[in-house]
């Protein structure tokens, strides 16, 4: 008897799956409308880019009211049908105790700085973990270097946001450069543009814009704001300032609204932080 089972509804990839509220640095919260197609395309891209395996075990201690914990981390495991150790919150000692039981840890930079404070963190202790991923906030070059020195493993940093999910990632196999967020994912078109949307040459700082199957449908009940943020050619204006090297590797230098002009020179927050 299947009468008590929930009804199975036919869905299109363009159907709305989630509304994630985000304010960024612009004040009023905006509801980013993500479709089933957005979520699926990004999950497939990440699963492939990060080489998800059938014997992988994800250690999940991220909040699920945020795109990082709700979609980015959990969808890789769900799509691959692999186990997930789901912790209600990040507690440094509990996460440390579960590290030998996992193969992948996704976290924010604070996870890694707090774990680094533990003297018992050694290469042998984390030998089963093949991938440490960081996002949602910039990972400092100091943390990147200290983690490698203490564990023998390089953290993989990536870059994304609620409106686009993940845009770029450092490579699974290949050089991971401290202070960078890697290359655009397959299917993601990324450009560095001036204020008019004109693409800038490699090496010049400008606004990061992205297009592709993971870019949101728009902002919930905010059509004018949607038109402001998504250009007619489909590129979403992230508001983040960045630069690409000759290989296409992306570095983020700050938010456009945080730029300071002093004596005719552009001063970027990341430059100040690196000096301090």
Predicted stretch roles:
Residues 30-33, 60-61, 82-89, 156:
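Short beta-strand->loop structural element characteristic of the AMP-binding/adenylate-forming
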Residues 40-57, 65-104, 118-120:
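Conserved AMP-binding/adenylation subdomain of ANL enzymes
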Residues 3-21, 28, 51-57:
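Conserved pre-ATP/AMP-binding loop-to-beta segment of ANL
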Residues 102-107, 116-177, 189:
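Gly/Ser/Thr-rich phosphate-binding loop
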Residues 16, 22-25, 58, 64, ...:
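Conserved S/T- and glycine-rich ATP-binding loop of Class I adenylate-forming
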Residues 191-209, 228, 244-247:
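Conserved beta-loop-beta connector loops within the AMP-binding
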Residues 97, 160, 212, 217-218, ...:
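AMP-binding/adenylate-forming catalytic core of the ANL superfamily
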Residues 17-41:
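Conserved AMP-binding A3 loop
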């Amino acid at each position: 008897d299947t009468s008590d089972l929930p009804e199975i509804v036919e869905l299109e990839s363009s159907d709305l799956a989630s509304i994630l509220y985000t304010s960024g640095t612009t004040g009023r919260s905006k509801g980013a409308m993500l479709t089933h197609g957005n979520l699926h395309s990004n999950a497939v891209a990440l699963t492939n880019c990060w080489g998800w395996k059938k014997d992988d075990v994800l250690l999940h201690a991220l909040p699920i009211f945020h795109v990082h914990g709700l979609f980015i981390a959990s969808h890789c495991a769900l799509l691959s049908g692999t186990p997930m150790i789901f912790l209600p919150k990040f507690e440094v000692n509990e996460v440390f105790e579960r590290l030998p039981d996992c193969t992948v840890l996704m976290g924010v930079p604070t996870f890694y700085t707090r774990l680094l404070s533990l003297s018992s963190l050694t290469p042998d202790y984390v030998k089963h973990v093949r991938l440490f991923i960081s996002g949602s906030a910039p990972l400092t070059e100091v943390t990147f270097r200290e983690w490698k020195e203490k564990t023998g493993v390089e953290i993989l940093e990536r870059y994304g946001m609620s409106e686009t999910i993940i845009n770029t990632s450092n490579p699974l196999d290949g050089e991971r450069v401290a202070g960078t967020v890697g290359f655009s994912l397959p299917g993601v078109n990324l450009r560095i543009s001036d204020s008019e949307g004109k693409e800038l040459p490699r090496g010049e700082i400008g606004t990061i814009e992205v297009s592709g199957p993971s870019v949101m449908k728009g902002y919930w009940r905010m059509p004018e704001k949607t038109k402001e943020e998504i250009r007619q050619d489909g590129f979403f204006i992230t508001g983040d300032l960045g630069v690409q090297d000759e290989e296409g590797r992306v570095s983020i230098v700050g938010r456009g609204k945080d730029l300071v002009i002093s004596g005719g020179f552009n001063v970027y927050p990341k430059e100040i932080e690196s000096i301090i």
